């Protein structure tokens, strides 16, 4: 069974580097989940989410490299879910899963949303604190069990904190 590999990044640049590296490993932006606070999205992605620039950069090539385009595109287009009241923005497969469940985790707050996304409660509490302080959580479901360890090491090497596979 494939495993969800997650890591918490303190900066947009570090999160972008992680998304770029995951894509270079053969994953697509549709395989990558991004979670951040609404405040972080507003601060870090205000320009991209208000325009079609992110989508155009992905389609048009490598404007400034894959990283800027890919992370911005994940947060600006595709499956995205905003959980009002708890200020969480979720994009990617985790958003699709929560939307399919009627976003049941929203009633339990941020930790409930993370647990609903498949993250154990004790880890969700750690990620909750990181997201509230401006962190960006990147998650990717490994295509195979043997790839999970490689993804875990990759995220750690790129500066992620609290890297885990579930």
Describe each PLM feature range.
Residues 2-50, 101-166:
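Cytosol/matrix-facing juxtamembrane amphipathic
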Residues 49-126:
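Small-residue-rich hydrophobic membrane-insertion segments
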